Amino acid sequence: MSDILTDTSAGVLTITLNRVDKKNSITAAMYASMAEALVQAEADPAVHAVVFQGHETIFSAGNDIGDFLNAKPSTMDSPVFRFLRGISTFSKPVLAAVCGPAVGIGTTLLFHCDLVYAGDNAAFSMPFVNLGLCPEAASSYLAPQRMGYGRAAEALLLGEPFLAEAALEMGLVSRIVPPSEAAALAQRQAQKLAAKPLGSLVETKRLMKLGQVEVVAQRMVQEAQSFGRMLAEPAAREAFTAFMEKRKPDFSKI
C-alpha cells in the first residue's frame, strides 16, 4: 500500500500519511507524491479544500533520516522544496488533523495550514538545532510571528517540544479533541468549506496572507541555502552519526 494515500470526495482532497510502521517519517518519494497531489488539487475547480492527516497515534516523525542522508535535497527542485512551495502557496483552504508526535516538518507544515485540529495526545517539536541544522518551511519567520519570539526561541533554539494545550494557546491549533475525533472534525470543517463559494474562499485567504507571501518565499530560499550548507558541516555529521548509532551527539569539540 502507498505511503501517501489520496482521496477526493465532495470537494475535499484528503492526503494521509500512511507509513505508521515507520512513524510516518517522510521520504523524498512521499514529498513528491504530496507535491503532485497539491498541484492537481490547485488546478481542479471541484476541490475546495485539502486535509492532511496521519494516524491517531502519530502524525509524523519528520524526515526519514536514512532516506534523507541517501538523497539530500540539493536544489530548490528537490521533492521536499516542491512540496513546501506547494503548500505555502496553495490558494484554497488547507486543514490538518494532528494526533501524537509531530516532529520537524510535521510541525512546520502546520504553519501553512489554515485550520489545525489536534488530538489531546499531540506533541509538537522542531529540533533542527539538535541536529546541527536550521529551521525550514519558513518557520524561522512564521514561528516567531505565530508563537511570539520567546516561545519560538524555546521551540527553535532549545528544540523543546510543546503539547496541544500550548499550541492552542499560541494559535497554532484551532481546537483540541480526543484523538479518535480529530480526523472526523477536520473532515466536517472541510465539508463546510466545500459548500462555500470557491472564489470567496480563495480571495479571503489571499487577503489574509497579503504581505507575507513574498517574505515566506524569500525565507524558504534563505533557509534552504543555510540548511544545505550546514548539512555538510561537522555538527550535522556528528548529529546524524549519533542518531544512526543510537547515542547522544557530542558537540563539545565542534
Locate each region found by the language model.
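Short beta-strand->loop
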Residues: 214-219, 253
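Crotonase-fold acyl-CoA enzyme core
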Residues: 88-201, 228, 233, 238-241, ...
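Glycine- (often His-adjacent) and acidic-residue-rich active-site loop
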Residues: 32, 39, 46, 54-89, ...
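Conserved CoA-thioester-binding segment of acyl-CoA-metabolizing enzymes
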Residues: 1-55, 85
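Short, charged, surface-exposed hinge/linker loops at domain edges
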Residues: 205-214
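Charged catalytic carboxylate motif
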Residues: 29, 33, 79, 86, ...
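Terminal peptide-recognition signature
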Residues: 15, 19, 34, 52, ...
